[in-house]
């Protein structure tokens, strides 16, 4: 029943926008058809398969000269290990107030639908305002996103779209090169009525010809977990001097328990293009404090302290490119290399093949298991029970 109501809402927005808004709606999006094979490790099945049909639909409508309405929806049909993994992620989701995406079961698949964005934007002469379910992003980091604490990233899934937050922001432009922004985000607990856990703050962006600087402060209201609230201080810098350099950091301060460097998440790296742009390389290091914004259990994904991400993209021609990437953890010497081959048959339609091989000391010489290995340890440090030795995805993507 909920799925039908959501479908009716989408139809109403798309069709009714012709009458509600002054301009024609602009509908765009992407569809992905993906087949997965996973060679299991530990207690996982030795071989498993799955199929996913995914669509991201985006609606943009102008009304007058200053206002824009945005909406985005994710539609998916799953079978096999895709559905099994979705159910597992839902059961393990760190936010107990967040329900996983509901699924409706068909003849040989399960279908899901979720609202991704729903907000408006007002463009003023000096002040811009956005409000609704939207992305409020911070920092210039390309991989780890230390400053981007409202929308945490995971480079193991580079194509994943960050979830939105319910909130608003107002941006003021004293001069063309300077932006001052105030923002507010609702608590993670949607049942909170007293403002506990609400996040509000300020950011500043200054741009020069070859460099940009962002400073950020955010305060999270006291709640039942953090009785004195949480302070966050961010600084992000990028510079284009032959190489493109980036420094992106966020310090999380809990007044009840000052944890020194453990509250710091800091990414630093560079990118560079060679051979007329045919070869692109990027490397970015992450220091992940144990109670920082990128740490597991504090909104992030990582259990150790020191990581390195590297990637190289080579374009054979206008239609075909190969991407080689890896994530390496210095603490337990585990790493996860993966390769992606993309071929564009015609404009807007491409085929892709991705393979990932989790590795650690246990795989190579019988040592200890690592976070990025086939069977990673549990978050509490205990021995893991299941994982994957090899993962391969074959897919087709259509953009419109």
Task: Walk through the language-model features, giving the residues of each.
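Repeated loop/turn-to-beta-strand initiation elements of outer-membrane beta-barrel proteins
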Residues: 25, 65-69, 126-129, 177-180, ...
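Transmembrane beta-strands of outer-membrane beta-barrel pores
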Residues: 33-39, 63, 75-79, 124-126, ...
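Residues that define the transmembrane beta-barrel architecture of outer-membrane proteins
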Residues: 45-53, 111-116, 125, 162-166, ...
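Outer membrane beta-barrel
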Residues: 60-180, 360
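Outer-membrane beta-barrel "beta-signal"
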Residues: 343, 353-357, 373-400
């Amino acid at each position: 029943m909920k799925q039908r109501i959501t479908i009716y809402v989408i139809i109403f927005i798309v069709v009714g926008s012709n009458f509600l808004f002054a301009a024609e709606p602009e509908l765009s999006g992407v569809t992905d058809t993906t087949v997965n094979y996973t060679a299991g490790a530990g207690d996982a099945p030795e071989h498993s398969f799955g199929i996913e049909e995914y669509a991201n639909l985006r609606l943009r409508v102008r009304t007058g000269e200053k206002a824009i309405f945005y909406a985005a929806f994710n539609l998916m049909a799953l079978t096999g290990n895709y559905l099994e993994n979705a159910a597992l992620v839902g059961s393990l989701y760190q936010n107990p107030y967040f329900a996983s995406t509901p699924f409706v079961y068909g003849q040989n698949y399960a279908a899901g639908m979720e609202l991704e964005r729903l907000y408006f934007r007002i463009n003023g002469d000096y002040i811009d305002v956005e409000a609704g379910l939207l992305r409020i992003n911070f920092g210039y980091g390309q991989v780890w996103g230390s400053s981007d604490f409202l929308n945490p990233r995971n480079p193991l899934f580079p194509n994943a779209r960050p979830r939105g937050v319910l909130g608003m922001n107002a941006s003021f432009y004293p001069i063309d090169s300077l932006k001052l922004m105030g923002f507010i985000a609702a608590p993670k607990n949607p049942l909170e009525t007293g403002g506990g856990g609400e996040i509000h703050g300020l950011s500043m962006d200054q741009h020069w010809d070859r460099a940009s600087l962002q400073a950020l402060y955010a305060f999270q209201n006291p709640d039942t977990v953090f009785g004195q609230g949480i302070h966050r201080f961010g600084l992000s810098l990028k510079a284009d001097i032959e190489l493109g350099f980036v420094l992106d950091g966020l310090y999380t301060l809990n007044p009840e328990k000052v944890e020194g460097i453990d509250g710091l998440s800091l990414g630093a790296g560079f990118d560079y293009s060679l051979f007329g742009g045919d070869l692109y390389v990027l490397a970015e290091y992450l220091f992940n404090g144990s109670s920082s914004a990128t740490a597991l259990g504090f909104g992030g994904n990582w259990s150790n302290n020191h990581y390195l991400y590297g990637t190289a993209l080579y374009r054979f021609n206008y239609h075909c490119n190969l991407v080689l990437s890896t994530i390496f953890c210095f603490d337990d010497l585990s790493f996860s290399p993966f390769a992606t081959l993309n071929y564009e048959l015609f404009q807007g339609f491409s085929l892709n093949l991705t393979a990932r091989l989790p590795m650690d000391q246990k795989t190579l010489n019988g040592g200890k298991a690592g976070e990025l290995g086939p069977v990673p340890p549990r978050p509490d440090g205990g021995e893991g029970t299941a994982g994957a030795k090899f993962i391969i995805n074959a897919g087709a993507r259509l953009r419109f």
